[in-house]
């Protein structure tokens, strides 16, 4: 339990220190820290439409649409604890605005459990624990499938292209391997930091994964199923402590976030950190976090591990089945950062060997490029976008 104790100690240190140094309300938040994705679009020259998409199992997800003029539809899928907002936070430099300016028909999806996915036809996320009984498996098998089908019906297109970051890539690989008919509906998939095999994850995330079973028991004993939801008190406190003055940038970002995602202090400046905190974290389920811990600890890209007895009941096997990546026959482009401790070059090399069609592969040139630089770096237009557009052209 040493890792848990250390985490609690760090959080208490942040709370006490920030309370001493920070006076709430002194720092006026950046405008972009408070804008909705619709307001972002208007500010940067594009209209944004909102749609409700209902999954097969009753979850209601918000799908944002930035209409394009000349090119095909692209669906963007965010990472864990994130939302569709992530792709527009950089304004004119963001992926959404960049694609829209190029004429693409842009769709930004959300998964169950984040701030745009806390609705269900029958379940109440505040009172029904069943609402939170999901991991990234369901985000791929149900959520992504529903979003893709909605876009195809809405546009009368035969297929779309997808771009995923982190968990957004996991969802794509789950869908394409579990429901192979979607390989015809997704004709090209760009995977930014593809999170599948996580055998070589580095500390501190690897240390947390070792404590995964203990963390899981601890959370379940407290009845905690939703983690870091947008409206939860813990998230509100975190956003308050980490959005005030430049002091919080050094304490919350440089000292706490960067060790997890990769030390690269030059691509996220203090002013933009304030924008990030205004929109993140956005919530997920306990089970989603634990499923990733299982990938790290068990060193397999596999279904959720419920334990031998429940596994046998669900899967007819004592261990959860691996996802059959040989079923992924669509065109795939893999992007990996040399300084990403979560999705490492070694693990992406394993993924490359598992795919039946040789994927396009791009190792990011800056040596310090990390896990979150794919969505928030201040030089994405130089080091990332040219290769994204090259992949999209190959998908035509």
Q: Language-model segments: which ranges?
A:
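Conserved alpha/beta-hydrolase "acid-adjacent" motif
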Residues: 341-347
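Alpha/beta-hydrolase-fold enzymes
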Residues: 153-158, 169-313
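N-terminal cap/lid segment of alpha/beta-hydrolase-fold proteins
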Residues: 37-67
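Short, surface-exposed "cap/lid" segments of acyl-processing enzymes
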Residues: 55, 66-121
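Short beta-strand/loop motif that positions the catalytic acidic residue
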Residues: 328, 334-336, 340
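Catalytic active-site module of serine/aspartate enzymes centered on a nucleophile-bearing elbow/loop
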Residues: 362-396
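Alpha/beta-hydrolase active-site loop
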Residues: 130-152
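Cleavable N-terminal signal peptides of Sec/SRP-targeted secreted and luminal proteins
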Residues: 3-27
């Amino acid at each position: 339990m040493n890792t848990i104790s250390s985490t609690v100690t760090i959080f208490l240190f942040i709370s006490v220190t920030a309370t001493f140094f920070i006076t709430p309300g002194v720092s006026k938040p950046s405008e972009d820290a408070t804008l909705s994705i619709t307001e972002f679009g208007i500010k940067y020259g594009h209209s944004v439409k909102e749609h409700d998409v209902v999954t097969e199992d009753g979850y209601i997800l918000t799908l944002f649409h930035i209409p394009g003029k000349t090119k095909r539809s692209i669906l963007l899928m965010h990472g864990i604890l994130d939302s569709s907002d992530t792709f527009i936070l950089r304004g004119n430099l963001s992926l959404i605005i960049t694609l829209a300016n190029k004429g693409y028909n842009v769709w930004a999806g959300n998964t169950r459990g984040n701030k745009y996915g806390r609705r269900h036809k029958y379940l109440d996320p505040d009172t029904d624990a069943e609402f939170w009984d999901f991991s990234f498996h369901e985000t791929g098998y149900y959520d992504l499938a529903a979003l893709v089908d909605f876009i195809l019906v809405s546009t009368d297109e035969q297929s779309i292209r997808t771009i995923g970051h982190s968990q957004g890539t996991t969802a794509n690989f789950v869908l394409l391997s579990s429901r192979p008919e979607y390989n015809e509906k997704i004709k090209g998939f760009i995977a930014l930091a593809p999170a599948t095999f996580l055998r070589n994850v580095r500390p501190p995330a690897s240390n947390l994964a070792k404590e995964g079973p203990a963390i899981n028991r601890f959370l379940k004993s407290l009845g905690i199923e939703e983690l870091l939801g947008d409206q939860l008190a813990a998230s509100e406190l975190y956003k308050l402590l980490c959005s005030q003055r430049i002091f919080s940038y050094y304490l919350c970002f440089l000292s706490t976030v960067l060790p997890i995602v990769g030390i690269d202090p030059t691509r996220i400046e203090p002013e933009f950190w304030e924008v990030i905190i205004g929109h993140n974290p956005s919530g997920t389920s306990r089970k989603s976090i634990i499923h990733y811990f299982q990938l790290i600890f068990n060193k397999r890209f596999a279904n959720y591990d419920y334990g031998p007895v429940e596994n046998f009941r669900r899967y007819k096997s004592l261990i959860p089945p691996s996802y059959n990546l040989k079923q992924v026959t669509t065109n795939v482009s893999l992007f990996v950062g040399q300084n990403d401790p979560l999705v490492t070059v070694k693990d992406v090399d394993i993924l490359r060997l598992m795919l039946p069609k040789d994927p396009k592969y791009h190792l990011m040139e800056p040596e310090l490029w990390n896990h979150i630089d794919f969505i928030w770096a201040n030089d994405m237009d130089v080091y990332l976008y040219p290769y994204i557009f090259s992949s999209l052209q190959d998908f035509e």
